[in-house]
């Protein structure tokens, strides 16, 4: 049996040794034939992949609400500075936007459980950009109120997600979007960390940089590794 599997693996290595990542992130053989349209379906370098927490999978809806939802009766003056609160309250639909974001979090939870984990929910997921670590390494515990409000955070989160993609024609960054929405949740950032606008900017800049650093390099020979992983 060992000799058979060894033979099969050698055959696979021989057949796949010329596979490499092209500049459009497709995997092609030496003849230019496409084997995979996007390397690994996300174009991320496996050497950067690591386990990171999801926070919401095994929590009840009530617990998620407590951690991640600002209700309509939130006392904003206790959490964010007056100017920041004033900017938000000028938007008559600010609560609708908060509600919509929370529904999105719950939809993410359902997607992870049913699609990603196939009804066997896990607390962690493998992905290159460890957002929680970036947050904790670039934020300081303090007693001052935040000078950035939830609506500003949601708007900037959306901008971050939109600019982190592989190709203009391939913007499948669903897992990244979920991780951003979870870890950069306004209530977590404001209530737990009292985040400042400066800290938020530093964090999102580093997330953007890490996302781009984690992409597979065009020209990388990936066939042998893939063959040995089967």
Describe each PLM feature range:
Residues 1-230:
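Core, soluble structural subunits of large cytosolic macromolecular machines
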